[in-house]
Amino acid sequence: MWWYLFPNINYNREIKNSKGNIEHIIGKSALKNEDYPNTIKYIKKKLQQQNWKGFIPNLGRDVEAAEVSEDIFKFISKQLDERIKNEKEIAITMPVCFSELQKQCLYDAAVAAGLNVKYVLSESFAAAFSQESFLAGEENRLSLIFDLGGATLDISLVKISREGEDFIVEEMASTGLAYGGTDIDEGILAEIIMPQHAELFKNLTAKGIDYRKKVIEIIISMKERLYEDEEDECDDSDTLGDGNMTEFRLSREDVVQVLEKHGVKERIFTVLEEMFESLPDIIKEDVTDVRLFGGGSYIDYFPKLLTEFFGAEVFDYEDFDPTALDRNDGNQLKTAVAAGAVRYITAKENGNIKVINRIPFHLGIKNNNRFKRILDRNRVWGNSNTGWVKLNNQEVQQDGFVINLYQTFANMPKIVPLTDDGSLIYMGKISLEKGLYDLQKPIFLKLFFDNQGELEAHLAQAKLVDEENQIVDVEVKKFGLGGWS
């Protein structure tokens, strides 16, 4: 078993002397190009956006996140073909804050690329297995996994217990934010670098020079040096394409300023508090240890924040040394997800662990311009099913005969305003065949999980059957949500 790590970057390069042909450059090779308009970065972040599309000049059209994902998986499939000849079984890791349909979108893209997806893991859960100490000792533990990556913050609460020689690993809860290293980089650009060089950027824009992505690369380099080399301030320089060298500076104080302006501490404390409030039998004082992963964990702001929330007796930032973690466990914080996934699969196939997913979530729809919660997956009782929900016909028509579906991990009332604070995750849409419906009659919706764990959506209207009015299915839609670890 082996793992291969690459940046999720897709560069659409036009092949010279081959009219109309485009070569997809994926991963590390794509990082080296400076043809920014034809390059797509951080596709997982774009999968979280409701209607993301990006125009690619070399293609002459927009591309959607699912299409880019499939290109990346085709690249992986080709890499596997060169290394192994037997069936290509893979594990995919995904952010905690992905909805079930976003997970399905990635899963479908992998299958379309010819890959056999055997495991789907949350990134924070996979990261925990990168440490040998995660499955060690005789005592029961309740571990908080904090994984700050490039696009998302993923948090999982995991209970570990022993059953003879085997381990029982229970995922008790998860939460997260659509906030990661890329948001920090963009914040540094907007709040620190742009004000320092406003005139320069104005002149570059007037000359038609696309400087933004190059400056982001400089910011990433300076940020990594600040924390990996334990510097208080660092600098870098570049011509940015106009022939004049410009010097850039970044300090730790600058980074903290950005994080505070973004309200990061308050947002993280809020999702942690809401997670514990959703668990009737667990409080934060039950947590025995905290484990940090992800490139963002190098920024000492986050270890300090976790010490403040849990207390130094559970996690002391002064004892946290990311370089020691790299050395002892043989992998970096940045690659912990991939390495952990391999270790998890090995243990799973050897029969040494039993994994139980107890994470609850709730599904709902946009109804009367609000979120209406209509289906729960409860961590104790399993799945609940809905009765018939009457839709707002006028709203359905205004939305183009689609029903917008949302997911939340938060314990919230049945009906709440639609917000963009991250608590509601857009899942996708249920499209209705307009010609099948009598628009003078109400449309009804019922959601439930079938025996395979797939979500079924039944759309119905009242019809006369044997001289009686009955609610009869007009359409049935299925969404594959089963099998997620």
Predicted regions and their residues:
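Conserved phosphate-binding catalytic cores of ATP/NTP-utilizing and phosphoryl-transfer enzymes
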Residues: 118-146, 334-354
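Glycine-rich phosphate-binding loop plus the immediately following alpha-helix
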Residues: 3-14, 160-206, 247-270, 390-404
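Gly/Thr-rich phosphate-binding beta-strand-loop-beta motif of the actin/hexokinase/Hsp70
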Residues: 1, 135-170, 341, 441-462
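Helical "lid/coupling" subdomains associated with nucleotide-phosphate turnover
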Residues: 193-194, 226-354, 390-393, 397-398, ...
